[in-house]
Amino acid sequence: MPPTEPILLTAAEARVLGALVEKEVTTPDYYPLSLNALVNACNQRSNREPVMDLDEDAVRQALHGLEDLHLAGRAHADGRVTKYEHLLGEAFNFSRAETALFCVLLLRGPQTPGELRGRTERMHRFDEIGEVLAGLQKLMEREPPLVAVLPRQPGTKESRYAHLLSGTVEALHAADSDSSTHREAVPIAGSDAGHEERIAQLETAFVELQQEMAALRKKIDDLFGE
């Protein structure tokens, strides 16, 4: 059942939630995520703005906050390593298009429809900008609203959209205006978005391989230690 009261996430909680949603779609073979894999997903340099440097304690604390809000939890698994999953579907019943848009807004902050179209390509393909706008409109019409359009900045042609799980429109606009003085506009092409996602997949696969090797070494040590 969708929440009836506004949700306010910390920056770390928003990053953890976005990373879990992204990895479920882009690297399903490695989802749900272990704590170590989730830390790497949060801190990866591709498809993240800003790039963060969260440690395990910060991610663990963010997970506790998301669990209290029923937005994430521990996955039921037979393995020794605890893994985590998001509960966004249970909370909001998003369509695939809405999930992709909301996820990228969580991971990269305020963006134009054109930027969102390019950056969601690996999660959901939007054939035209009109489909992006339609998805954003549905998120804006939720009660309470989950997305808002920010006032257009001076000298820009397109408005930017932001999710509302981290504050009000006024607060987000102030933060967006401040950060715009330090941000260069970089065109996002579909091929660039795909390249970023392939890098992210390799990063996740490498972490999982390290965990499997560590588990194998432990089994060998236990065997010869008996």
Give the ranges of each region predicted by the language model.
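A short, conserved structural fragment
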Residues: 60-63, 67-77, 136-153
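Short, amphipathic alpha-helical interaction segments positioned at domain boundaries
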Residues: 78-82, 86-115, 159-194
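Residues in the recognition helix of alpha-helical DNA-binding motifs
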Residues: 19, 62, 135, 164
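Amphipathic alpha-helical oligomerization/assembly segments
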Residues: 185-205, 210-224
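Short acidic, hydrophobic short linear motifs in intrinsically disordered regions
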Residues: 27-53, 110-126
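N-terminal intrinsically disordered, low-complexity, charged/polar
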Residues: 1-19, 217, 222-225
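Positively charged, polyanion-binding regions of nucleic-acid-associated proteins
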Residues: 10-29, 93-110, 136, 141-142
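Helical coiled-coil/dimerization "stalks"
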Residues: 119, 151-158, 162-165, 211-226
